[in-house]
Amino acid sequence: MKAFMDKDFLLETPTAQHLYHDYAETLPIVDYHCHIPPQEIYEDRRFENIAQVWLGGHQVLADGSDYYFGDHYKWRVMRSNGVPEEYITGDKPDRERFQKFAEALGMAIGNPMYTWCHLELKKYFGYNGVLNGDTAEEVWNLCNDKLQHDPKMTVRGLIEQSNVAMVGTTDDPIDSLEWHKKIKEDPTIKVVVAPSFRPDKALNIRKDGFADYIHKLEEVVGRKFACANCVVNALEERLQFFVEMGCRASDHGLDYVPYVETNAEKATAAFKKAMAGEPLTQEEGDAYTTYLLISLGRLYKKYNVAMQIHYSCLRNVNQKMYKKLGPDTGFDMIAVTDGSAAISSLLSKLTETGECPKVILYSLNPADFDMLGTILGAFQDDEVPGKIQLGSAWWFCDTDDGMYQQMKTLARLGLLGNFIGMLTDSRSFLSYTRHELFRRLMCNLIGNWVENGQYPSDEKTLKKIVEGISYYNAQRYFHL
């Protein structure tokens, strides 16, 4: 029997162990997509206890509304163990909340959360034991002592000891980026903290709050909008500002990828109806969103910004809990959509005029991996190796099986050697161990191919592939 999560955890062969320990393990991390707040980096926040880091909490905003923040992966685990909501997003004492989580974690055999938590305990707290209900007090005291007193356990300290070269935050076009500016001007902060341009609220024309958001965008740029191109021009102005602040990527979170034949007139007609409070048909909404996606894609090419597209998520399916807690609190699911025609049409439209940017495609539905893998090869060019990427296994796919499936699909239908690798997509400063887990799985996959005689034991090429996927491909892709 193997020891629990030892140094060769998940590395099944001598070749896998060699590739990981000698090439992948110590390389810097490019975490090009996450949701951590830049303010906490600048202020170098120190957390009081492990529950604050892992479980988040609840605060009342200036307008009196409730805001729930934290790791919804962990919240789902707790709910699945029958934990009352007051211990999850409520105001129960942190020690009691942590106890409930520890008890739930003990039941999470096979869940990636189990691996993530123990990798974090091992790396950041030096704890080699097992967290469950019986050990919760021991772990609570150990973690809190380090969080409160160890100089390396502030936010910046965690980033530094994780060897993070770049953090790609997720930011709205109307954001002032004040914290990014302060970070950029602070010579003591070595990590690159790059804003990412996420204009979802300007594209989601059929969702509640669209008109209110457009008015906020108007205020930021100082003019009123009469047409769809007015929105595009305003977004370009904001994109220019983001690029000045170090932006390297955009991000689009879509329920599904729309594509219909459209033009400025159709998009403007839909825009005017929405601003007047009139309901839109799906076709009208898609005409506007398609027009914006095409226009933004061209701008991303112009400013050398990668275009990330996340889709196939059905959000807030539990309406009772959504109304109580708001979005991003653990009530989303995989959607079944067919993005093949829309995605290929979007890329084809951009390619026709030589205006296709670098694109990273993520589907929450693993059934789409093969389809996306074949799209890649149809639109690659000489701008950069792996210009069109099959995004890392995302969210519910971020499991051992999901990562293997994504990498095997890319290897089978494209070039795994040009993959830009892992991202955390996380709200936690302890989540960089997910890069370790990914690198172990990647080295194990490649190591097995070598050991089985499916790929030669060519040291020079293997080193290049492993180091590229771990770090250098992303460094090149995001021009670090």
Residues of each region from the PLM?
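C-terminal amphipathic alpha-helical interaction region
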Residues: 307-309
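Short, basic/hydrophobic alpha-helical segments
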Residues: 346-352
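Metal-cofactor-binding active-site regions of metalloenzymes
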Residues: 2-303, 355-357, 361-373, 377-480
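A short acidic, glycine-rich active-site loop
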Residues: 281-282, 331-337
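Divalent-cation-assisted or electrostatically stabilized phosphate/pyrophosphate-binding catalytic cores
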Residues: 339-343
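Active-site loop ensemble at the mouth of alpha/beta enzyme cores that anchors a bound cofactor
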Residues: 322-334
